[in-house]
């Protein structure tokens, strides 16, 4: 919960916030193994009403965390969706109780490879069990019950967060009123899997990999940095890279690259290794690649059980999760007569568009939530 007055850095900020951790006895994974105990890092913004029917769960993407809005003490930058979460914003904390949690398998406070194995007293690292998108959602469901919430007003997310939102609609059809899926898909294509495989192989090829049992003093940093560089290319569009970098020379005294785009990617890779774990990168990308609700008739059958309204947003410039994948979701929902609104935004920023400030996107989210909050259609 916020612990101070709103920060002036961003108008409408929820202010200074703290990440909390909820601990549960255990979670049985879809593969049959058990996480004991289960820890979930989370943050909340706003106030849960007496009926407990105003809660919105926001789900993060691959490298995200529970810190979606506001500022941690001493930070200069706010949470990853601060533009959209806060008083008077699209996810209005004057109306809604926003919950954001770190996925299990990650490395930002929830159970994952960095967690301590009770049998050895050491971090699990690569011995941590495989975690699926379904497992991530089942862990979130425990957190929702922890708050005494039976039905969420909405579940929202982009990219991997969109997959979690989709999984919520299928696994717990009576537990959410609205589902917002942005820049996502019902399953990864061969190309999407290929991008992730290159990143994983970069990590596995690092001399410090040591079968995933590396020390913090000798981590596979070069491999993880290369994985992040590869991934970051897919998050941007050709137009954005052309406009931002073109063929400009690198800034500063950088000898290892001849171009500005190269120095940018090197910076992204090097800064990433300071805030993310290589094992978690492998676990989370595998969860992404193994997620599948199917396509075509198979997807239509799976989505026949959903009971909520949908907002699906795609981006013309997103070549990592191209609009046709969102359209497949929409078509399957329409066959099942599920209320769905589909919008393709011509945002030049590529896949990262769902994360970036946009007045148009803010208006779309705001209008959808307001319409359904009032019992109408968007």
Swiss-Prot record:
One of its GO terms (cellular component) is cytoplasm. GO terms for biological process: homoserine metabolic process; methionine biosynthetic process. Its EC number is 2.3.1.31. The active site is at residues 159, 318, 351. The keyword Acyltransferase applies. Belongs to the AB hydrolase superfamily. MetX family. This is Homoserine O-acetyltransferase. The gene is metXA.
């Amino acid at each position: 919960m916020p612990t101070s007055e709103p920060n002036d850095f961003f108008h409408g900020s929820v202010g200074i916030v703290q990440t909390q951790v909820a601990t549960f006895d255990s979670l049985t994974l879809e593969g049959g193994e058990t996480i004991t105990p289960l820890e979930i890092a989370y943050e909340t913004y706003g106030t849960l009403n007496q009926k407990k029917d105003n809660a919105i769960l926001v789900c993060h993407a691959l490298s995200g965390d529970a810190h979606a809005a506001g500022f941690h003490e001493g930070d200069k930058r706010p949470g990853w969706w601060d533009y959209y979460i806060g008083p008077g914003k699209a996810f209005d904390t004057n109306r809604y109780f926003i919950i954001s949690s770190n996925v299990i398998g990650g490395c930002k406070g929830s159970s994952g490879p960095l967690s301590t194995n009770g049998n050895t007293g050491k971090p699990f690292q690569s011995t941590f069990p495989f975690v699926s998108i379904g497992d991530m959602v089942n862990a979130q469901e425990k957190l929702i019950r922890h708050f005494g919430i039976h039905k969420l007003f909405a579940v929202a997310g982009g990219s991997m967060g969109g997959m979690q939102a989709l999984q919520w609609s299928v696994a717990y059809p009576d537990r959410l009123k609205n589902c917002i899926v942005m820049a996502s898909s019902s399953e990864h294509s061969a190309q999407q899997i290929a991008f992730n495989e290159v990143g994983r192989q970069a990590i596995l090829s690092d001399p410090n990999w040591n079968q995933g049992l590396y020390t913090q003093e000798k981590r596979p940093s070069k491999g993880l940095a290369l994985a992040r560089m590869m991934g970051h290319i897919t998050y941007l569009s050709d137009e954005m890279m052309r406009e931002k970098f073109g063929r400009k020379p690198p800034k500063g005294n950088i000898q290892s690259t001849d171009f500005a785009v190269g120095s940018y990617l090197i910076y992204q890779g090097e800064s990433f290794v300071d805030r993310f774990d290589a094992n978690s990168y492998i676990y989370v990308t595998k969860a992404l690649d193994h997620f599948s609700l199917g396509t075509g008739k198979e997807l239509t059958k799976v989505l026949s059980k959903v009971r909520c309204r949908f907002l699906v947003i795609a981006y013309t410039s997103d070549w990592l999760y191209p609009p046709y994948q969102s359209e497949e979701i929409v078509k399957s929902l329409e066959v099942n007569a599920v209320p769905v609104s589909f919008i393709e935004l011509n945002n030049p920023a590529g896949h990262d568009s769902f994360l970036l400030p946009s007045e148009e996107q803010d208006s779309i989210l705001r209008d959808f939530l307001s319409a359904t909050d009032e019992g109408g259609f968007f």
